[in-house]
Amino acid sequence: MTQADNQNPKPMVLIILDGFGESDETTHNAIKEANTPTLDKLFRHYPHTLLEASGRAVGLPDGQMGNSEVGHLHIGGGRKVPQDLTRIDAAIASGEFYENPALIEALEKAKALNKAVHILGLLSPGGVHSRDNQIAALVELAHRCGIKKIYLHAILDGRDTPPKSALLSIEKITDQFHAYGNGKIASLIGRYYAMDRDKRWDRTEKAYDLLTQGTAQFHAPTAKEGLMLAYEQGNTDEFVSPTSIHRHNETPITIEDGDVVVFMNFRADRARQLTYAFLDDHFTAFNRQVRPKLSAFVTLTAYAKDIHAAVAFPPLELHNTLGEYLSARGYRQLRIAETEKYAHVTYFLNGGQEAPFNGEDRLLIPSPKVATYDLQPEMSAVEMTNKLVEIIQNDDYDLIVCNFANPDMVGHTGDETATREAIQVIDDCLKRIITALQSVGGEALITADHGNAEKMFDEKTNQPHTAHTSNLVPLIYVGREAQFCKEVGALDDVAPTLLYLMGLEKPREMTGRNLITLK
């Protein structure tokens, strides 16, 4: 059937199950272990296929696991988008990184004033928010520029990496500092505090006070000893308490007037809150007892339009994304998600566009205020489904995009039982959504942005698996009689497929392909 013959269903709902990968493994697979009558029925009775969601298929290096930002960019973009990880690694390999104007200008200011350069960043090989080789490249660049005081304030991962795996990265960068003789790791803190994105400002405040005042629950003479101290307290990397690294008779190293700060996270969403604390003149989220007057603050990528900082790698602009294309044709669309994934169905799905397009409404369902989501694995899925069912029945939108955060956010805790419960909640929600859609003649495409919940234990490290995976993800069509092509697709094929089902040609900017044929 061609687009011309295709009757536009209303509404079309794109359901993104965040962190829902496909694996034949049944052991430690929370998806396979869960009781999922709705998903079982969908896979039995409706056309479905599998999609690549990692590596080169989503603009990342070979073997690099996907993530929510990359996944939504490709789902909404309908094309391969070179990712910041790949761009920056390529710049390091070519030498362009060491000539980057924003970095060079900031480092020269520090040198001229004989001030310190403070590097903030997730010290991790994970490649989701940062990569430790890029931090090492900046240390090398600062050394080349003749900076005498280079301080790394290391945020620790344990979420996109095994829970206790920071030591290798710490040892590598410590060896580099020893070789240069002009810097050190000045502090440690878990990403739980320094990289909150859900307005839990008390966590951000702890990170800010550590950086600006040296306020720390723990002190240690070396970063390795600080990490071991955290492990003794029962903390994994993600939850390392603020720890200042200095000898007993020395004062903490802090960010002071005239210093230069470079934030080396390339993913924006979890870097924003801490950046606002430094740069926002009208900041009110907590009381900044100290606010250093910096010579420069550089972000590796652009974090937000209202963050006024030098940017080392400005974003690539995407035109005619799914949202923009539908908006230009007068289609009404809704984006709905809970707090943890709201930016993904709005900003990232729109290719980095902050403001909604004409005809695009947005609905934010607050995520529950709990320390970790294994404590409330249902999160806000039921509340979101209640609203979604009501909206479907009102028949106001041509396209609705929703994201269920549970498989990813609960999967990140490493709690297999809680993740299984999360999957079962999602299954119940899907039943209600599909029932509502079928009552009004609507249709659904169900997919995921990357894997996670299908692997809850790592046999190699003998630790809970808290990171994403490189597994394929499903694509299920709930609607008219149709057949998917036999070849495995990729996330950039979702938008062209969706447009075909809505009776529209894809724009020329979309290089992804339609994967389905209506009978």
Curated annotation (Swiss-Prot):
Keywords, sorted A to Z: Glycolysis, Isomerase, Manganese, Metal-binding
One Pfam family in the UniProt entry: iPGM_N
Cofactor: Mn(2+)
Pathway(s) it belongs to: Carbohydrate degradation; glycolysis; pyruvate from D-glyceraldehyde 3-phosphate: step 3/5
Cofactor note: Binds 2 manganese ions per subunit.
Binding site for Mn(2+) 1: D408, H412, H468
Binding site for Mn(2+) 2: D18, S68, D449, H450
InterPro entries reported in the protein's UniProt record: Alkaline_phosphatase_core_sf, BPG-indep_PGM_N, Metalloenzyme, PGAM_B_sf, Pgm_bpd_ind
Record GO terms (molecular function): manganese ion binding; phosphoglycerate mutase activity
Residues that bind substrate: H129, R159, D160, R191, R197, R267, A268, D269, R270, K341
Gene Ontology annotations for the cellular component aspect, listed alphabetically: cytosol
Entry's EC annotation: 5.4.2.12
Active site: S68
Catalytic activity: (2R)-2-phosphoglycerate = (2R)-3-phosphoglycerate
Family (UniProt): Belongs to the BPG-independent phosphoglycerate mutase family.
Quaternary organization: Monomer.
Annotated protein name in UniProt: 2,3-bisphosphoglycerate-independent phosphoglycerate mutase
